Amino acid sequence: MNSQTQMKQIVAEAAIEEVKSDMILGLGSGSTAVLMIKSLADAIRSGKLQNIKGVATSFQSEVLALELDIPLIDLASVSQIDLAIDGADEVDPGFQLIKGGGACHVREKLVASKANQLLIVVDETKLVRKLNQSFPLPVEVLPNAWKQVQEVISEMNGISTLRMATKKAGPVVTDQGNLILDVLFNDGIKNPKDIEKSINNIPGVLENGLFIDLTDKVLVGKIENNIPVAYSPAKVG
């Protein structure tokens, strides 16, 4: 197990300590969330946690939860979620996020907005001083609108590329049947709140991967003296 996987594993296990029996949980997507879901299944099997119900944020997390016998309920059937646990591609000091590297950010944001608490689990490589200086911002767009949206983003001084699939010909297609534009702004995103609103107001855009003022707590995995540890940084601002 390499050091990054060790960091992800320790923080995934630490996240389960935040879970109580009888909770409705938002089950995140991505590599760290996968480890968290597996740790959750272990806790349920051992009897440590009981009467847990999950709300999946993607087809990935839905399939994994079903394989591990974690009971699932549909997002539309719940009025609130006790706790959502998810990963992130970038986390800034104010706990603003970029998500969507796995093209799941639309459902992830729906679950996060319905959660009483959003817990983000990452390894320390995901902590940044400013968003979008290296990781592109995912923007989900209607298939027949991607070029038009790309032109508007260009007018906003953003460079966008249509995300292409790696194991099939053509672009990545989301769970909603849409496409993804990956956007980089010159010197990153200086005003995440404004950019989130501006992009979402472009006709043809379904949702972008900026998660603004949604995160309550961040757990970070790191290697300290050759030992993986998890810690919770303080929010700045």
Swiss-Prot record:
Pfam families hit by this protein: Rib_5-P_isom_A (PF06026)
Protein's gene: rpiA
Natural source organism: Prochlorococcus marinus (strain MIT 9312)
Subunit structure: Homodimer.
Designated name of the protein: Ribose-5-phosphate isomerase A
Similarity field: Belongs to the ribose 5-phosphate isomerase family.
InterPro entries per record: NagB/RpiA_transferase-like, Ribose5P_isomerase_typA_subgr, Ribose5P_isomerase_type_A
EC number(s) given by UniProt: 5.3.1.6
One GO-annotated biological process of the protein: D-ribose metabolic process
A GO term from the CC aspect: cytosol
Top-level enzyme category: isomerase
